[in-house]
C-alpha cells in the first residue's frame, strides 16, 4: 500500500529534544547531530575557543557570555530518509519552566549523560517531566575520550535512579587515552575510534564479528578479551532492546561515544530515525487529534523576544499537530475566537530564519507576534478546541524590581509583561500598592531579566528581596465567599502577567492557614496556559 504524499511527509518526521545536566555536553551533541545531518559545516564548539564563531545553537547576548543555552531554539535537518526536528532546551539548572514546556512539544528525548559523572540532579528532574507523558528516551553516554566510570555501574545507576530499563546497543572498548571504539551488539560490528575534531567526520574502520582476529590486532589482545568478557556479563544482566517497550517509555537504548571527538553520534541518530515515533496524537479539551488528520491544528509552547535585535519582535513557536501549513492560510486563534492569515511563518536553523512555504505535523514554525499570541494558544482551521497539558508553575523565588530612573515606569511594565508572556519570568502586580514583583523558578532568571530589560528595553533596574514565600493562583465557584476572601485578603492579592488573580503568601504557614480558613477557594500550584 502506498501512502498519500501527505502521509509520507508525516511518516518522515521525527521531533526530539535533548535533556541533560549542565555541562554534560548537550550543546556539543547538538552541534554534532547537525553536523552528521550536514546542516552545519563548521560545528562551532561552545565559547568559540577564542574566536567569534560562537556555537550555532546558543544565540542571545547573555548566553554568548556564559556559554549556556538559555533559550530554546529549533533546528531542522535531514538524516537518511527522515526530516528531524531538534528542539534545544536550556541546560542551565534555572530554566526549568521553559524546558518543561518544550518537552510538551516533542515525541522523543535524547538523554545525554557525562560518563565520568553518571546521573546528575538536573537529569533526574527532567526525566520526571518526560515520565508524565511516557516519552520514549534514547541515552547517549558521552565523553568516552576521558576517564569514565565503569559502564555496568552507569547502566545500574540509570536503572535504579531513573526507574527505566537500559538496553545497551553499543559497548565501549577502553576509555580516556585507551578509548578504541565501540562494539554494536545487534550488528556484531566494531567501530574503531579515530578522533574527528571540529567539523571533520572521519571514515570509521569497521571490523565484522566479535571473534575476528582483526579485532585483537586493532585494539590489542587485552582490550579485545576484556570486551568479550564484559559482553558476556552485559548480555546476561541487561535488557534486550524491544521497540514496544521503548515506545512505552519503559526501556532506553544506550549508546556510547564522544561528541567532541565526533564519534558515536551517528549510531545514536541511526537508532533515533529507525525507532523514534513519527508525530504522535495530542489531547484537547474535546477530543484526541492525530497527525494523519488533514485539517490543520497546532499549539504554541514558547514565545521568544528579540530573536533579531534589529527588529524589536517576538516569535511564537508553534508545534504542528495535524494538517499541512501553507503560506497565506487562514487559521483560527481559538482563545480569542479570531481568524488570522499567516503568511510569514518562519522555520529555524538556530538564529538563521527562513520563511517557510509549508510545514507538516512534528514541524515547529515561528509566528510573528505583536503581543496577541500567548503560550498555550491553539490554532485550528475553525474547530473550537484547546490543546491541554502545557503548564505554568507557581514560582519558588521572588524579588521586587526597582527602577534607577522612576520616569521609565511605563517601559519597565511593558518589558516585564513581554518577558512574562514569553515565559522567561512571571510578574505580579499587587492590588494594594505599586510594587512590581517578579517570580522565577531559579536565581539566574533574575539576572537574565535585568540584563534583558537593559539591552532590549533600555531600562536600568535592580532587584531586591521581598517578603514573599510562594504564590498560588486562586479561584472559586462560590461568588459570595470569593468576594469575602478578596475583601479580607486584599494586601496579599496580586494580578499576574495575564491578569489572573494570585495569592502572594509571606510564609508557608500563612498560606496553609489561609487555605484552611477558606475551604471554598481553590489555591493552584500550576495553571494550564
UniProtKB/Swiss-Prot annotation:
The record's principal subcellular location, in a coarse class, is cytoplasm
Binding positions for GTP?
Answer: 20-27, 88-92, 142-145
Annotated tr-type G domain residues: 11-280
SUPFAM superfamilies registered for this protein in UniProt: EF-G C-terminal domain-like, P-loop containing nucleoside triphosphate hydrolases, Translation proteins
Which keywords appear in this protein's UniProt record, sorted alphabetically? Cytoplasm, GTP-binding, Nucleotide-binding, Protein biosynthesis
Q: Which Gene Ontology molecular-function terms are recorded?
A: GTP binding; GTPase activity; guanosine tetraphosphate binding; translation release factor activity, codon nonspecific; translation release factor activity, codon specific
Concerning InterPro entries, the annotation shows: EF-G-like_DII, EFG_III/V, G_TR_CS, P-loop_NTPase, PrfC, RF3_C, RF3_dom_3_sf, RF3_GTP-bd
Q: What family does the entry list?
A: Belongs to the TRAFAC class translation factor GTPase superfamily. Classic translation factor GTPase family. PrfC subfamily.
Q: Which gene encodes it?
A: prfC
**CDD domains, alphabetized:** RF3, RF3_II, RF3_III
Q: Name one GO cellular component term.
A: cytosol
> What NCBIfam families is this protein classified in?
prfC, PRK00741.1, small_GTP
Q: What does this protein do?
A: Increases the formation of ribosomal termination complexes and stimulates activities of RF-1 and RF-2. It binds guanine nucleotides and has strong preference for UGA stop codons. It may interact directly with the ribosome. The stimulation of RF-1 and RF-2 is significantly reduced by GTP and GDP, but not by GMP.
Per the UniProt entry, what is one GO biological process?
regulation of translational termination
Please state what the protein is called: Peptide chain release factor 3
Where is this protein found?
Cytoplasm
